[in-house]
Design a protein with these regions (language model features):
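Oxyanion-hole/transition-state-stabilizing segment in secreted/luminal serine hydrolases
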Residues: 260, 292-347
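Phosphate-binding active sites in nucleotide-utilizing proteins
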Residues: 256, 264-296, 304-308, 313
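Catalytic His-Asp segment of secreted/periplasmic serine-dependent ester chemistry enzymes
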Residues: 307, 333-335, 372-452
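N-terminal secretory targeting modules
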Residues: 2-4, 12-15, 19, 25-250, ...
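Solvent-exposed loop/turn segments at secondary-structure junctions
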Residues: 125, 193-194, 253-257, 292-297, ...
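Surface-exposed amphipathic alpha-helices with a cationic face
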Residues: 353-361
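Short, solvent-exposed loop/turn and secondary-structure capping segments
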Residues: 197-203, 258-265, 298-302, 335-338, ...
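Structural recognition of the beta-strand scaffold that forms the well-ordered cores
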Residues: 246-251, 255, 285-291, 321-326, ...
Length: 452
């Protein structure tokens, strides 16, 4: 046969052409298949766009320490979460200052399910490239353990690892994995060398586990230390039915879940996801939480403003059709004092809201305006501050600028003392809501609007 081909160069050329055409056809078919898949974000968190000067409601972030081989600034796995098991700055362990030849396994709680999955990583706030040596995803069993047989190795553009330049987002290649609604996934990332201060979301309501070396494929993390932050992980997408879509909750620490029970999935966005999943007419709807502690509509202080992060945290999320906007309390408390050096007015905030609404509508996304919850009892709350909150809420309720409104203020305020939270809804600081308060917020949302 070989000797025959040598005598017939035309046959060789034809074979090459047919091979190229076949390969191109396969590649084209694969790209068409991938393009036909309907991706929806089942979980997300807001990673910072740049280094920030404050965390939460004030105070500097943990200072980066020199690179160390051991696990820096983390707690042993046996350490219980926070005071009374509640999320928030009190008892919140510092974010690791660096990782080096270590694996971090993070837990995410899904909203909707699907048959294929991919992750998004962010190196947005770093000064140096991030090297990911290995990445895995699996169904989580308990603590750091994964369900046997569910572990999947992730690749990036066909490669087992990747280098993510500063400011860059990276999507993994899709893998087949049956993801159930309202389930826990474990995402494991191995970093082979010193990362420097990691891009992170520093209020994770699930414990993350850190071990020495590449333990991404281990069913249980060996001798882990813990933290409660999401490092580099910014989203998990699943393939879903054509009618599936996501709701983005854009907000501050109230949305982020500060004040709720660790490991409980009891922030209002998780409760809303359970309400939607329980009804066949809405079980195709995902809820993703893009809350940031201390976030403001207008100013970059604790993270960049809602206006600055809207494109990344809302418009770029897979399958988004609705956004629930609960912001402004930090603008009001921090800059609403009558003698503020950098004052904010209700008109300023309304102008910011109008910008967010216009940008969402440009992309076919509907906006629910959420009234600002009461903060009476906080020492910063003066009559002038309260007047701004009331003015903003009145505009949200009556302006018809939004596609729908949810009156969180009315749902959680004390009827006898309407400037304050109901006692059972107050986590203790007169700003953040308890588990019961978050339930009350989720119950106030008319889910019928999402069926329109």
């Amino acid at each position: 046969m070989i000797s025959d081909l040598r005598k017939k160069p035309g046959v060789i050329l034809l074979s090459i052409v047919l091979s190229v055409v076949a390969a191109a056809s396969i590649s084209f078919a694969q790209s068409r298949s991938s393009a036909a898949e309907h991706w929806v974000a089942t979980w997300a968190t807001s990673q910072p766009l740049a280094a920030t000067s404050t965390v939460g409601r004030g105070g500097p972030p943990p200072q980066a320490q020199p690179s160390q081989a051991q696990i820096p600034q983390t707690q042993p796995a046996a350490t219980p979460p926070g005071p009374e098991g509640r999320g928030g700055r009190g008892g919140q362990p510092p974010v690791p200052s660096t990782l080096n030849d270590q694996t971090i396994r993070m837990v995410v709680h899904t909203s909707i399910g699907g048959g294929r999955v991919r992750i998004e990583l962010s190196n947005a706030a770093a000064a140096a490239p991030l090297v990911i040596g290995s990445a895995h995803i699996a169904v989580r069993a308990k603590d750091s353990a994964i369900v046997p047989g569910t572990d999947r190795k992730l690749t990036f553009s066909g490669q087992p690892g990747c280098t993510i330049r500063p400011g860059v987002l990276m999507l993994s290649d899709p893998v087949d994995l049956e993801v159930a609604p309202l389930s826990d996934l474990a995402v494991s990332l191995y970093v082979p060398k010193d990362t420097g201060p990691p891009t992170n979301h520093n209020l994770a309501l699930h414990t993350a586990y850190i071990s020495k070396g590449d333990t991404t494929a281990h069913e249980v993390m060996p001798e882990p230390n813990t933290t409660r932050a999401y490092l580099w992980l910014s989203a998990v997408d699943v393939t879903a039915a054509p009618n599936a879509f996501a709701i983005v909750a854009l907000g501050d620490s109230i949305t982020d879940g500060q004040g709720t029970t660790m490991e409980g999935n009891l922030n209002w966005t998780s409760v809303l996801a359970r309400r939607l999943a329980a009804n066949k007419a809405t079980s195709h709807i995902a809820v993703v939480n893009q809350g940031v502690q201390g976030n403001q509509v207008l100013r970059d202080e604790a993270g960049v403003s809602a206006l600055a992060r809207f494109d990344r945290d809302v418009l770029s999320r897979s399958g988004v059709k609705w956004v629930i906007l609960l912001e402004a309390i930090n603008d009001i408390i921090r800059h609403g004092q009558i003698d503020s050096a950098d004052p904010v007015t209700s008109d300023d905030l309304i102008a910011g809201y109008r910008q967010l609404i216009a940008r969402a509508h440009t992309h076919g996304i509907r906006v629910i305006g959420a009234t600002v919850t009461p903060v009476g009892g906080q020492r910063q709350v003066t009559e002038h501050v309260e007047a701004i909150r009331k003015s903003v809420n009145e505009w949200i309720r009556t302006s018809h600028a939004f596609d729908a409104v949810v009156d969180f203020d009315a749902a959680v305020r004390d009827p006898g003392h309407p400037l304050q939270l109901r006692t059972e809804f107050d986590s203790g600081d007169h700003v953040h809501l308890s588990d019961a308060g978050n339930q009350g917020m989720a119950d106030a949302i008319d889910v019928a609007i999402f069926r329109k």
